[in-house]
Amino acid sequence: MKKFFVLAIGALMLAGCGTTGLEGGSSSSDGKVDEKKPSELTVGVSVSTLNNPFFVSLRDGIQKLADENDTTIKVVDAQDDTAKQSNDIDDLIQQNVDVILVNPVDSSAIVPAVEAANNADIPVIAIDRSSDGGELLTTVASNNEEGGKMAAEYIIKQLGENAKVAELEGVPGASATRERGKGFDDYAEGKLDVVDKQSANFDRAKGLTVMENILQAHSDLQGVFAQNDEMALGAAEAASSKGEDFVIVGFDGTEDGLKAIKDGKISATIAQKPEEMGKLALQAAFDHFSGKKVEEKIDSPLDLVTE
């Protein structure tokens, strides 16, 4: 049986996927809204990449709630390309969608696209990663800083203080990369010896290559925090000769990541719930168009999974 250590319950619970009110408000939801039923909405969805199981699950969560409410969904895959994502969002604006749900490739590069949607009076909801500018109706995400701290706490518990560890970082510029790294680094300072940190772009193959290079430079390395499960799986392949005392912690809780924990390939993951995250984002859009106020930040649950 998996051991789940619950960090927090989401600010919004989906009861039968019905429309649930969100308390509080953001500037986008304070003005008068042309109310629409879910079945009358056309929702644009821009995902950073569908070549990652986490974001496939996020897309599926949106699609499931949309199907239950007869909502039209237009999904575009940015393929981890910031220019393509901006063009995709421009296309969605031209198609006069009612709302855009965006999972940014890069939190800075997405700003002009968010501002373009603002200028077209199309509300924007960010998922998993935020935008560094423009006006958002809300951001639906886990507490990434707290998740990074949880990873550091777990590694210290397993290896003790002053253990030599490395970090595999995500896409440079993504808010999740910054926040997970900050949470880990702040807690690890003075407690762990972080000998190296390099970006592997949230990618499994790059995680393998980067981890091989780190191990060549630091043969006495004792563990690694990878900012997502894909990189953790690459790191596990590179460190397969290190044995079970080598600690690998991922982030996301993907199907492949959870299986790797069962198989003893990685030690733990900070598990998000991407399908629920997608549902929460679409539910926020439903609430907005029913005239309800929407929180500026909606938290999605986060757990530490160790077996």
Predicted regions mapped to residue ranges:
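Extracytoplasmic "Venus flytrap"
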Residues: 41-65, 69, 73-91, 95-97, ...
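Hydrophobic alpha-helical segments within soluble ligand-binding/sensing domains
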Residues: 43, 85, 140-165, 206-208, ...
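Short, solvent-exposed amphipathic alpha-helices that sit
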Residues: 54-71, 147-151, 175-192, 206, ...
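Hydrophobic alpha-helical
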Residues: 99-118, 184, 201-259
